[in-house]
């Protein structure tokens, strides 16, 4: 099987890193060789696989060593649960420089050091929030990641982010092989959430590849810096991640998405009762004025 490179995008705080690590643990359990490349200055993309607070990042270690050329692959690549390879790109101090540069530097370093040559089945890039700035778009722009999965929920801002990320994919799809592979709904228990995300997926020309229900076992596992798969293999939630893993293994629906306009997105939210019908007469009015 040829190595598949997948990037996970989505609104900040949606649960991308947790979803990615649980998915990767399920893939490893199924016998797949996987590497996670964390593309977020927070460096929290590998903690559940490594049982660590935060892995040392390529950018931190390069700063200590002098340059990235002074690093060895074994300095930055750690192996965790299920023999999953873990790397964190990291970024500059807050308020200084461009964190996206860290992603570019890290991926180039991994390529030069042969990290991708070890007959891997999957590489997952866990990418910061809904920022589609140049650096964070690197896995898409440089044709590193071929499959993009967007973690979403029934909340309005998560859906806005999914639509914006789809626009970013369209921008680079024509020049490279990058495609949208599906939406992963990480449930927030909002009304008619699964129906809403299926409808959004249809508008974007893709699929809701899996609906992950909300379950407190995820938090219990996280407190112990573990994935559900490792912490409680018999939990129903662990089976949800296994099901997602199997769907990704067999997924062949890779599309150039069809992003919608803001009006169309708001229309969809109104259809599902998430947004109220817009009433022009209340715009710009304070609570006191509306009561008057």
UniProtKB/Swiss-Prot annotation:
Q: How is the cofactor bound?
A: Binds 1 [4Fe-4S] cluster per dimer.
- Domain of life, per UniProt, equals Bacteria
The alphabetized UniProt keywords are: 4Fe-4S, ADP-ribosylation, ATP-binding, Iron, Iron-sulfur, Metal-binding, Nitrogen fixation, Nucleotide-binding, Oxidoreductase
Q: What is its EC number?
A: 1.18.6.1
Q: Provide the residue positions that the database annotates as binding ATP.
A: 10-17
Q: What cofactor requirement does the entry state?
A: [4Fe-4S] cluster
A GO term, aspect molecular function = ATP binding
This chain's function reads: The key enzymatic reactions in nitrogen fixation are catalyzed by the nitrogenase complex, which has 2 components: the iron protein and the molybdenum-iron protein.
* Name of the protein in question: Nitrogenase iron protein
Its source organism is: Teredinibacter turnerae (strain ATCC 39867 / T7901)
Where is the organism placed in the taxonomic lineage, from the top?
Bacteria, Pseudomonadati, Pseudomonadota, Gammaproteobacteria, Cellvibrionales
Q: Quick one: which gene encodes this?
A: nifH
């Amino acid at each position: 099987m040829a190595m598949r490179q997948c990037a996970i995008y989505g609104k900040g705080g949606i649960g991308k890193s947790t979803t990615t690590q649980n998915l990767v643990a399920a893939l490893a359990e199924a016998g797949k060789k996987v590497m996670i490349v964390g593309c977020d200055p927070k460096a929290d993309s590998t903690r559940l696989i490594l049982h660590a607070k935060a892995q040392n990042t390529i950018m931190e270690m390069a700063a200590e060593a002098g340059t990235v050329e002074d690093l060895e692959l074994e300095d930055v690549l750690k192996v965790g649960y299920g023999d999953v390879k873990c790397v964190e790109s990291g970024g500059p101090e807050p308020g200084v420089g461009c964190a996206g540069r860290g992603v570019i530097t890290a991926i180039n370093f991994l390529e030069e050091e042969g990290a991708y040559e070890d007959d891997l089945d999957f590489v997952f890039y866990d990418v910061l929030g809904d920022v589609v700035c140049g650096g964070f778009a690197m896995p898409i722009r440089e044709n590193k990641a071929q499959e993009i999965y967007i973690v979403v929920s029934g909340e309005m801002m998560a859906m806005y982010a999914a639509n914006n990320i789809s626009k970013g994919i369209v921008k680079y799809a024509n020049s490279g092989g990058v495609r949208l592979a599906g939406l992963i709904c990480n449930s927030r228990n909002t009304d008619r959430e699964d129906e809403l995300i299926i409808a959004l997926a249809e508008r974007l020309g893709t699929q809701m590849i899996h609906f992950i229900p909300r379950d407190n076992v995820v938090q219990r596992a996280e407190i112990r810096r573990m994935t559900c798969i490792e912490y409680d293999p018999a939990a129903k939630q662990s089976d949800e991640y296994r099901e997602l893993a199997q769907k990704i293994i067999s997924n062949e629906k890779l599309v150039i998405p069809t992003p919608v306009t803001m009006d169309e997105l708001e229309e969809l939210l109104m259809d599902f009762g998430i947004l109220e019908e817009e009433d022009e007469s209340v715009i710009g009015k304070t609570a006191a004025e509306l009561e008057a």
